[in-house]
Amino acid sequence: MGRLLLLAGLVLLMKHSDGTAYKLVCYFTNWAHSRPGPASIMPHDLDPFLCTHLIFAFASMSNNQIVAKNLQDENVLYPEFNKLKERNRELKTLLSIGGWNFGTSRFTAMLSTLANREKFIDSVISFLRIHGFDGLDLFFLYPGLRGSPPHDRWNFLFLIEELQFAFEREALLTQHPRLLLSAAVSGIPSIIHTSYDALLLGRRLDFINVLSYDLHGSWEKFTGHNSPLFSLPEDSKSSAYAMNYWRKLGTPADKLIMGFPTYGRNFYLLKESKNGLQTASMGPASPGKYTKQAGFLAYYEVCSFVQRAKKHWIDYQYVPYAFKGKEWLGYDDTISFSYKAMYVKREHFGGAMVWTLDMDDVRGTFCGNGPFPLVHILNELLVQTESNSTPLPQFWFTSSVNASGPGSENTALTEVLTTDTIKILPPGGEAMTTEVHRRYENMTTVPSDGSVTPGGTASPRKHAVTPENNTMAAEAKTMSTLDFFSKTTTGVSKTTTGISKTTTGVSKTTTGVSKATAGISKTIPEISKATAGVSKTTTGVSKTTTGISKTITGVSKTTTGISKTTTGISKTTTGVSKITTGVSKTTTGISKTTTGISQTTTGISKTTTDISKTTTGISKTTPGISKTTPGMTVIVQTQANEAETTATMDHQSVTPTEMDTTLFYLKTMTPSEKETSRKKTMVLEKATVSPREMSATPNGQSKTLKWASLITEVETYSQDG
């Protein structure tokens, strides 16, 4: 009762907004009419005033052209769907192409060449105008996954850029409003980094529908909610985490539309007495009477289930669940939708996306709360608000994390949160005509150090989005080594004093060191093979490095007449730094100490001028030292060859032959640049040339592409990281 009173107060406060125009984007599926009895929904059953944008799912593709899935869609559903705009002139309708069952092969074929994309774009403009749609929604699940090659990530971006250009040109020529362009994208971090360039998508698309649901389901071994608003730290499976992740990658917040599911997912419990959150399950529970899909209930089926079940609230996730016997259900209701809508407004996101409008209680016959109870609350909070300076309520976002909410089982919590396997499945129970609906691929999870807590905050995190890195595995390692730097710095300074006492002994053994140079170079292959082992002892090595640089000054005072050997020593230093570069592939911490060693070389060369006057008497040792010079020369030559090879490989990895090079970003970093902690970035910026004005060769490459400028930027990083 207390929660209901609190919610009532919050809703009254939310009636006053900051004047921002929020989108309420609602999907309608072309199979909704095929459900039995009162669950059968046609377009004329929809309320045209509830949503700001209606999206018809789904169209298909044939011979690289957009087509209707069947004649009924084209002749009956399309006209009836767009006729809703006669009742609401402000309503926008879009046609979505793709979906889970559509797969990826037809997308890949269409994206592969400029000619295929142009054919698709021409068909899209004609098809949308003929049937009265206001835009296109791309529902490609997912570029670079499920059989889609990695370069589809970039070809997908090229298609979006070319669609936007064509839509603008068509609007200019016909004086019609420009067609809208949106896309449905994943809310799972590892899929995001594999499939999308978040920054560029945010610039090209009118809005982005984030699939912030299907985060838990009966494919897992433990119960979990389908779409929690928040999650525990180190857990990326929540709507807030997904939205903030896209925003951190550079997507404008006002273009991000958060997903709201009008369905729940159920589990069959292992033990009836263990019925809380994160308890063991044996798979999906019984299918719904109308949707007929195991592990899945539409909201109108949820209402029937909870009327005879025990209901609970997950405090830190702001969502409900219910259980009856061995059946456990995580779902959304009007209260959880209200909290999520308030979160959207508080974070200034673009609005809410509903999957789907036809799974709400359309006629109000199942739940007893009137037609469209879920979507109606979103309409009240996001659309029917008036401008006012009243601030949004803050207190509910600052509650502490309660890991032991009603019925939770903490014993199972750790195992679930530490899993590194993500199941990819159809969003929102899309597949309605087949018995097998779940598909999955194993993905490596991203470290969730930026997880969103009920406080609505996120810990700082940096992201490096480059064309070369399509997976998050490398980035995860880079983040770990950054932490490693800061931990070893203090230890280095503590050992300096002890090493300075051995200066005199070091100066007497200089000749012996030069003779052993050849032996050191011979052991380089062995060192590189043992890299994994070396990384475990790196902490000890890094602590002595700074001390060595400080003892050089003492050596210069006692080393009379060693000017002839100085050159030989400087050559061996280059060889050592090369060894370090190999090791830095496994432990970046070692590469940081290399800078300290290279600085000692400069110090020695500076003392050479002063000592050259006392060369007499040391010349007897010169022949022995000169014998090592050829070996040093070989090392220097090898380094130069490797640097050239690395640069060549970097260039090749950026632009695979299958990619259309309408635009790309090129980054290179040679070993010598790594030694000086410098990174060179070259950005090729495209001139404003229409894709239609580019003549394409058979492999899809444009040969009339012009570039406005070649910009070279050099960033210098301090040696302390």
UniProtKB/Swiss-Prot annotation:
GO terms under cellular component: egg coat; microtubule cytoskeleton; perivitelline space; transport vesicle
Sequence repeats: 486-492, 493-499, 500-506, 507-513, 514-520, 521-527, 528-534, 535-541, 542-548, 549-555, 556-562, 563-569, 570-576, 577-583, 584-590, 591-597, 598-604, 605-611, 612-618, 619-625, 626-632
Signal peptide positions (record): 1-21
Cysteine-cysteine disulfides: C26-C51
Residues that hold chitin according to the record: L71, Q72, G98, G99, W100, N101, Y142, L211, S212, Y213, D214, W355
Polar residues bias (residue ranges): 444-456
Residue positions with a glycan: N402, N442, N469
Protein name, entry field: Oviduct-specific glycoprotein
Source organism of this protein record: Mus musculus
Lineage: Eukaryota, Metazoa, Chordata, Craniata, Vertebrata
